[in-house]
């Protein structure tokens, strides 16, 4: 792509570094900004800069937060003895949206993935193990996505905390609510049969 | 969507103002920036700001340019008597890529579109009419996309310059090179029959 303007070229090049945004899309976005008032570009740049400079991570659960300890960890009503292990802030948001979880979280910041060069030392695993060893934790819930990397990470952590006398659970895998059985893949359907739950549980409150 | 951080929320809100980028995509992009070195966010913000602040438009053809007169208009080898009328810089880039055009351009900056509230006065039409009336132009080539808005814009300009003694042409519509006839729509196929060209022209150079 040849540009008639170095300024446009530079903006497009920087924009197309973002995942899923190619040169063409980047050019479309940049031209859109050109048509909008100057302030919009100013607001966007400033918001990104502020976010990148001032962002903090909760020193307890490592979630993204504006304060030293995030709102969830600072909430004394929540059950601090149950820790849900997730990959990143998006998973926290997804679980919070269900309104079904009253414990706290531990954000790993990724999954063990040799292909992408992510090893255990780059993730917030040691602080989780320490928490468990401190004896204040009653249950750990693994809520990583059910991929090769997720399972590897689960197992890596499990090996380090298996000797502690705590409950270690993982979120249930099974047929989505509202799904037809015939379209489910075999592994999911198989798991949902193996891990069947007492029928009474499905209509009684816990 | 509820965010645990106002900084993230603001960045996501600004990002999702861009066309085709929803809140979820914006969050993905913002989290990507968080994982990259701080410099990348700095470069991106700076490139966008510089682009928006310092961008110039060629005073002759209104194309985006870093200088007062763009490279194409400043090039004395090009034929300044032939003007190709296009919508924006993307069309200039597309035509330049063909390597088939040696004239200069006139960038309208959009198409007449009552639905989007774009009238003739918001486009660079009057300066085009002036150029034609100055008598230095021999041919005008309309190269707007073949939509209702494009045709309206073509016709609006045509009405104002029809009395000048210049050649007014429009780019050929027809079956794409490499396309099968049976899959072409009727209107395009019809046009390509009506506007058939002497066979000799297709293998002789001009």
Curated annotation (Swiss-Prot), chains A, B:
InterPro entries, per database record: DNA_Rcmb_RecR (IPR000093), Rcmb_RecR (IPR023627), Rcmb_RecR_Znf (IPR015967), TOPRIM_dom (IPR006171), TOPRIM_RecR (IPR034137)
Superkingdom per UniProt: Bacteria
Cross-referenced SUPFAM superfamilies: Recombination protein RecR (SSF111304)
Keywords of this entry: DNA damage, DNA recombination, DNA repair, Metal-binding, Zinc, Zinc-finger
Domain (Toprim): residue spans on this chain: 81-176
CDD domains from the UniProt entry: TOPRIM_recR
Zn-finger segments (C4-type): 58-73
HAMAP family: RecR (MF_00017)
Summary of the function given for this chain in its UniProt record: May play a role in DNA repair. It seems to be involved in an RecBC-independent recombinational process of DNA repair. It may act with RecF and RecO.
Protein name per Swiss-Prot or TrEMBL: Recombination protein RecR
Organism the protein comes from: Flavobacterium johnsoniae (strain ATCC 17061 / DSM 2064 / JCM 8514 / BCRC 14874 / CCUG 350202 / NBRC 14942 / NCIMB 11054 / UW101) (Cytophaga johnsonae)
Upper taxonomic lineage: Bacteria, Pseudomonadati, Bacteroidota, Flavobacteriia, Flavobacteriales
């Amino acid at each position: 792509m040849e540009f008639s303007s170095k300024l446009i070229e530079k903006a497009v090049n920087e924009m197309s570094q973002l995942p899923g945004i190619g040169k063409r899309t980047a050019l479309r976005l940049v031209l859109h900004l050109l048509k909008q008032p100057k302030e919009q570009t100013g607001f966007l740049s400033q918001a990104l800069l502020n976010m990148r400079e001032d962002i903090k991570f909760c020193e307890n659960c490592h979630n993204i937060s504006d304060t030293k300890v995030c709102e969830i960890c600072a909430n004394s009503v929540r059950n601090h003895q149950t820790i849900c292990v997730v990959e990143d802030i998006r998973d926290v948001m997804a679980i919070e949206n269900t309104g079904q979880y009253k414990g706290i979280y531990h954000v790993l910041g990724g999954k063990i993935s040799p292909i992408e060069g992510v090893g255990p030392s780059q993730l917030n695993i040691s602080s989780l193990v320490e928490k468990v060893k401190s004896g204040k934790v009653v249950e750990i819930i693994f809520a990583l996505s059910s991929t090769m990397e997720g399972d590897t990470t689960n197992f890596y952590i499990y090996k380090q905390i298996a000797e502690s006398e705590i409950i270690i659970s993982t979120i249930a895998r099974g047929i989505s609510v509202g799904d037809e059985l015939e379209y489910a893949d075999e592994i999911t359907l198989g798991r949902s049969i193996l891990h069947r739950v007492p029928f009474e549980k499905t209509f009684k409150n816990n």
